[in-house]
Amino acid sequence: MSQNIVPKSAYREIMLSGHPMMDVRAPIEFNKGAFPSSTNLPLMQDSERQKVGTCYKNKGQDAAIALGHSLVNGQIKQQRVEAWLEFISLHPNAYLYCFRGGLRSQLTQQWIKEAGIEIPYVEGGYKAMRQYLIEVIDEAPKQSPIHILSGITGSGKTDFLLQRSEAIDLEGLAHHRGSSFGRYHEPQPSQINFENNLAVSLLKHQERAEKCLLVEDESFLIGRSAIPKQFYSGMQAADMLVLEEPEGARLNRLLNEYVHKMHSGYVERLGEEAGFDAFAEYLSQSITGIKKRLGGQLHDEFQSIIANALNIQRQRGDTQPHMEWISLLLTKYYDPMYQYQLDKKQSRVIFKGSHQAMHEWLDEYSSKG
């Protein structure tokens, strides 16, 4: 590796190690997508970048470079260099990158060097690293067999996945549980960040040399995060494992996920009153999201039961009344929908069983030559 340039051959190690990187692109570029270990410390802010870009189109590169120097000068330049130096002091082995590994990387590197510090920039920049991660995702179905973990709503698929080293939690990466009630407290990542995080997870999975890749049975969209097409095609052709769980355990799990966790999460973020109001709105909006499938009359019945359960919870702190609408949700919506979908995939099912039986089956599968 050249002292000042990190070659493309290092991309895999960068992603696997979570190597700290300084992204000097403008915030608007960074917010569309970046890498898990990167921090945005821009050479130019959005408005400055826009002016330089317009100048480049109208007057060419030399004029654009001159304008860039005039916009990022004096105290502004000093503040940005100081921010870079502070980052490097915290991460002495850091790399930097811009969009293509061109002028912005070179100029940033030069200014930092003038302050007495050497920092390498990544060859090809964001664009080349992003392309590398896209290829990782597209090639993943060929790297190891995919097994799809299915199971009726509330069967604990995510809990199970988190206990398995061969698993990747797609819903965790998407910050969404993949259903009408599936949103998290924090917003979903951008599509690019979802894909980049998936690619890094796949690289780590490959590094562990697992016998298979275990992922949950998902729709193409998890909330608003789209599973990349090549990877999703691999999932659609994969063998399936069906996790089975008694109804009582399913109800308790959904009460915990939809009520206890969501309520406490909103209260933690917003305070007692505003948090409860946000939690109530989450339940109401989630039912409204499936109104067309439920039908108007059943939707209204759900809203009435939920409103009553919320009133009791607010007054007495008792969450058990929520069990009524959760049970109804299973029998009238989730269970029939799941059975319909599973019937279409029966030919792909290779094992069904409880949590313990599923662990034993996968352990045996992994131990085979």
From Swiss-Prot:
Taxonomic placement: Bacteria, Pseudomonadati, Pseudomonadota, Gammaproteobacteria, Alteromonadales
Positions of the Rhodanese domain: 15-138
Residues the record marks as active site: C98
GO BP terms: tRNA wobble uridine modification
UniProt-recorded Gene Ontology molecular function terms: transferase activity, transferring alkyl or aryl (other than methyl) groups; tRNA 2-selenouridine synthase activity
Gene3D superfamilies given in the database record: Rhodanese-like domain
Subunit record text: Monomer.
EC number: 2.9.1.3
Designated name of the protein: tRNA 2-selenouridine synthase
UniProt record similarity statement: Belongs to the SelU family.
Gene that specifies this protein: selU
SUPFAM superfamilies xrefs: Rhodanese/Cell cycle control phosphatase
Keywords noted in UniProt: Selenium, Transferase
Catalytic reaction list: 5-methylaminomethyl-2-thiouridine(34) in tRNA + selenophosphate + (2E)-geranyl diphosphate + H2O + H(+) = 5-methylaminomethyl-2-selenouridine(34) in tRNA + (2E)-thiogeraniol + phosphate + diphosphate; 5-methylaminomethyl-2-thiouridine(34) in tRNA + (2E)-geranyl diphosphate = 5-methylaminomethyl-S-(2E)-geranyl-thiouridine(34) in tRNA + diphosphate; 5-methylaminomethyl-S-(2E)-geranyl-thiouridine(34) in tRNA + selenophosphate + H(+) = 5-methylaminomethyl-2-(Se-phospho)selenouridine(34) in tRNA + (2E)-thiogeraniol; 5-methylaminomethyl-2-(Se-phospho)selenouridine(34) in tRNA + H2O = 5-methylaminomethyl-2-selenouridine(34) in tRNA + phosphate
PANTHER family per the UniProt record, alphabetical: TRNA 2-SELENOURIDINE SYNTHASE
Role noted for this protein: Involved in the post-transcriptional modification of the uridine at the wobble position (U34) of tRNA(Lys), tRNA(Glu) and tRNA(Gln). Catalyzes the conversion of 2-thiouridine (S2U-RNA) to 2-selenouridine (Se2U-RNA). Acts in a two-step process involving geranylation of 2-thiouridine (S2U) to S-geranyl-2-thiouridine (geS2U) and subsequent selenation of the latter derivative to 2-selenouridine (Se2U) in the tRNA chain.
